[in-house]
Regions:
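The Walker A/P-loop phosphate-binding site
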Residues: 1-64, 76, 84-88
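Short, glycine/charged-enriched secondary-structure capping and boundary segments
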Residues: 31, 58-61, 109-112, 144-147
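Switch/connector loops and helix/strand junctions flanking conserved nucleotide-binding motifs
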Residues: 53-55, 78, 105-106, 138-142
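Phosphate-binding/switch loop-helix module in NTP-utilizing enzymes
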Residues: 72-125, 130
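Phosphate-binding/switch region of NTP-binding enzymes
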Residues: 119-184
Length: 184
């Protein structure tokens, strides 16, 4: 994955992570959360649709005492407002806006002005702001876009051991492509 993100998720900007179910999108977000909390950073997970699983985060060794989990009850507008307020409040190393459960039509209708506002707010902080969804929504407002696509399962004998994922990133219109295998 380092080949795709070229050294990690940038701070002080908006990154988009997109992919369908089983693409590794949530696993990557939980890995980021785990790394940030283990380094002593406070993090926020804005959960638009109540899909965050604390047990999965614990399994990845995330420190849940360093996590503020905001459940927006299926309301994307509330999630955007919460993200805006929390990124402006400062003090967080990672802010995740999880729109994965939001209907695609709703996510596409988020105005570019909202994305520009979030990007501008992130630029005044040291936080990594990551928006996750089924598709790229913020378009030109994000500095890094990572698109994941499931490729094929990885088998050892008759046991499923992981999944191969194709990833493509766009960094201010420079495209990098790589593939990686997630094995448990």
């Amino acid at each position: 994955m380092d080949d795709v993100v070229s050294g990690g998720i940038p701070r002080g900007t908006l990154t988009e992570l997109a992919g369908p179910e089983s693409s590794g999108r949530t696993a990557l977000l939980i890995t980021l959360l785990s790394q940030a909390t283990r380094q002593g950073e406070c993090c926020v997970w804005i959960d638009t649709d109540g899909m965050f699983d604390p047990a999965s985060a614990l399994e990845a060794h995330a420190d849940l005492d360093r996590l503020l989990w905001v459940n927006c009850g299926g309301n994307a507008e509330h999630a955007l407002k919460a993200t805006d307020l929390l990124i402006q409040a400062g003090g967080f190393g990672l802010v995740v806006l999880d729109l994965a459960g939001t209907p695609e039509k709703t996510a596409r209708r988020i105005p570019l002005a909202s994305w520009f506002r979030l990007r501008h707010a992130a630029e005044r902080t040291e936080a990594a702001l990551v928006s996750a969804g089924l598709r790229i929504n913020a378009r030109s407002c994000s500095s890094l876009q990572i698109e994941l696509q499931p490729a094929r399962p990885v088998w050892r004998g008759k046991l499923l051991r992981g999944a191969r994922v194709n990833a493509q990133s766009t960094v201010r219109f420079a495209v990098r492509t790589a593939a990686f295998t997630a094995v448990k």
